[in-house]
From Swiss-Prot:
Its EC number is 4.2.1.90. Homooctamer; tetramer of dimers. Reaction proceeds via a syn dehydration. Belongs to the mandelate racemase/muconate lactonizing enzyme family. RhamD subfamily. This is L-rhamnonate dehydratase. The gene is rhmD. Substrate binds at H29, R55, E345.
Length: 401
């Protein structure tokens, strides 16, 4: 089989600060009013009262959705979405295009390495640039799968289990239990600036959900980089009587010493997890060395599927789990091939967590959701990532080349 070359790469955006708000899609924080994901949730900005009540007040949704599409010479296309918006479009169309167009559709690792090295001088340790590279990488995997007629998970070597089981992230673990999920992860609402009173309030929330959900249902806390080591340690011990399964991303990404100390002082049996906002392979190696229990890369932010596979290998070599942060089909096709991912995350994007809404709604068509907390591998058998781009969304292409 002669594989075609890539003819063109194109980039669109929707939502964010320079378009309509509340668009959802790849930037799942960009939701409308009265959504749980924009409620009083602890963040690094919560210490400033002006930005404490709503996360959108400090700009969590300013980037918007990036859509990258790659077209082969035979007319077939692949695409992906992430969080990078209009600025990501500029990076794709004015810089990264030179490493993509003219390459064979199978040259994914070569393109990936060239993108990483060519952006070192302005990418730092991740962020917007890495989100953009991740989106390109995922689009390339989607195109390759469609050209050869295989789902991405088979390109990675095939499934190691028949189905993926999920926990749900949202404000209502009790509803998640009714839907068949194995656990529920809640956001914390208070931080170090609230003192011991904040610890008592979040511990009371866990206690309330433990009573509602029963003894065996997993409960976890997502702290979203909002704490310090002392506060996180005290919160972990305050929640230990309620069998909290893990405490997540308590500290900013680069505080490796803090994660090591937190793991050392956490209650016996309670896991410490992080990784959502780490953006390079090297940062995950260092994070792994802290001894945390689970690494949680976002495939749309960490460097794409190509990097996620490498992160999973680092974790496996140390006996750690890798449980990616959300990311829907882009995670599904990876984790069903990882032996050290026994479960995965489903992010509830319905406003009150009462219904099953696809994570990247409305930008993806045919995006699967768990049924009774599970997705069978047969659901993932369409070529590429198995989803289509909803071109009825208000997509803008601000740059060309």
């Amino acid at each position: 089989m002669t594989l075609p070359k890539i003819k063109q790469v194109r980039a669109w955006f929707t939502g964010g600060a320079t378009a309509e708000k509340g668009a959802g899609g790849g930037d799942y924080h960009d939701q409308g009013a009265n959504h749980w994901i924009d409620d009083h949730i602890a963040t690094p900005m919560s210490k400033y009262r002006d930005y404490e009540q709503l996360r959108q007040s400090f700009g969590i949704n300013v980037l918007g959705t990036l859509v990258v599409e790659v077209e082969a010479e035979n007319g077939q296309t692949g695409f992906a979405v992430s969080t990078a918006g209009e600025m990501g479009c500029f990076i794709v169309e004015k810089h990264l295009n030179r490493f993509i167009e003219g390459k064979c559709v199978s040259d994914i690792k070569l393109i990936h390495d060239q993108m990483l090295n060519a952006t070192l001088y302005y990418s730092g340790s991740g962020g917007l640039v890495m989100n953009t590279i991740s989106c390109v990488d995922l689009a390339l995997w989607d195109l390759f799968g469609k050209v050869v007629g295989l789902p991405v998970y088979k390109l990675l070597g095939g499934a190691v289990r028949d189905e993926i089981q999920f926990y749900a992230t949202g404000a209502r673990p009790d509803l998640a239990k009714e839907m068949g999920f194995i656990g529920g992860k809640m956001p914390t609402h208070w931080g170090p600036h609230d003192g011991d009173a904040g610890i008592r309030k979040d511990a009371a929330m866990v206690a309330d959900m433990r009573e509602k959900c029963g003894e065996d249902f997993w409960l976890m806390l997502d702290c979203w980089m909002s704490q310090d080591v002392n506060y996180a340690t005290k919160l972990a011990h305050a929640c230990a009587p309620y069998n909290l399964k893990w405490i997540e991303e308590c500290l900013p990404p680069q505080q490796y010493e803090g994660y090591r100390e937190l793991k050392r002082n956490a209650p016996v049996g309670m896991m410490v997890t992080s990784g959502e906002h780490h953006g390079t392979l090297q940062s995950f190696r260092t994070l792994s060395e802290t001894g945390i229990d689970i690494m949680q890369p976002d495939v749309g932010w960490c460097g794409g599927l190509t990097t996620l596979v490498e992160i999973a290998a680092i974790a496996k070599s140390r006996g750690q789990l890798v449980v990616p942060h959300g990311s829907s089909v882009y995670s599904h096709h990876a984790v069903i091939t990882f032996t050290n991912t026994p479960f995965s995350e489903f992010l509830m994007t319905s406003p009150d967590c009462s219904t099953m809404r696809p994570q990247f709604d409305p930008i993806l068509l045919n995006e699967p959701v768990p049924v009774n907390g599970r997705i069978h591998k047969s659901v993932l058998d369409k070529p590429g990532f198995g989803v289509e781009l909803n071109r009825d969304c208000n997509l803008k292409r601000p740059y060309s080349h």
